[in-house]
Amino acid sequence: KFPVEDKKGAKYEDHQCSSYDVEVCPWSNIPDEDFALADDHHWTIGQFVWTGFDYLGEPSPYDTDSWPNHSSMFGIIDLASLPKDRYYLYRSVWNKEAETLHILPHWTWPGREGEVTPIFVYTNYPTAELFINGKSYGKQSKNNSSLKNRYRLMWMDTKYEPGEVKVVAYDKNGKAVAEKVVRTAGKPHHIELVSNRNELTADGKDLAYVTVKVVDKDGNLCPTDNRQINFSVKGTGKYRAAANGDPTNLEQFHLPKMHAFNGMLTAILQAG
């Protein structure tokens, strides 16, 4: 959501919320506050997050007069078991052993050309440099000037132009150690299926979760394509359900069809 501003209980005409993780429910706070408490006070023993996984019910801040909102929006992972942007913020702080380098938002914004579109980076590395179409927008390093600056790298004044966003991360010694690229999507070309498992036990119970993406000819996610996708299964397995993570979507999970949400959804298959 633009402009990117700290807000409590913000509501929008599309009944969605911002992925920049600067908006919270009236009773909540940004994750950075909890991170700082844990880092600054030896007496803390952990963090309580409400909630790790979206669920049906309690669609705050759309609690009243907000049909068709019917599921929570503040989870780290959405109702389709897909990680949200904030998942990578938590991961960058909680998991110091694994590399995290995540760019948000996506970079397919037809009609926003020339408009301010901030870029956030969630990473376990202390510093990163941002490039848009080959032009450097400088390095940012985590610092103590604000809560968000302690845990995020933020370029607040960048303007949208179609093309490529690249981030190069640097370790504490100033060595370039990782990079990530996000590109503007072209026209939708095909459907990409990625299963979390290659084999199932033939017990009639085992499940596979298949991430479904609408992508362009180069494999870039098409985040504005929300077409309906129909499912059928050949062989001894069977289709069980699908979800797209949209808190306003009323399609039934068990039917073999579902609209994508931001170009994605999850389908569940069961062994025969």
Which residues does each PLM region occupy?
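Short, solvent-exposed loop/linker segments at the N-terminal edge
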Residues: W109-G114, E199-A208
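Beta-strand-rich structural segments
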Residues: I119-T123, V168-A169, K205-P223
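Extended substrate-binding grooves/exosites of carbohydrate-active enzymes
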Residues: K1-A176
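Short aromatic-acidic-glycine turn motif
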Residues: Q140-K142, P188-L193, F231-T248
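Extracellular Ig-like/FN3 beta-sandwich strand-entry sites
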Residues: Y160-E164, K205-L207, N262
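Edge beta-strands of extracellular beta-sandwich domains
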Residues: G174-G186
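Short, hydrophobic beta-strand segments
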Residues: L153-Y160, Q252-G272
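Low-complexity, acidic Ser/Thr/Pro/Gly-rich terminal tails and inter-domain linkers that flank the onset
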Residues: A185-D203
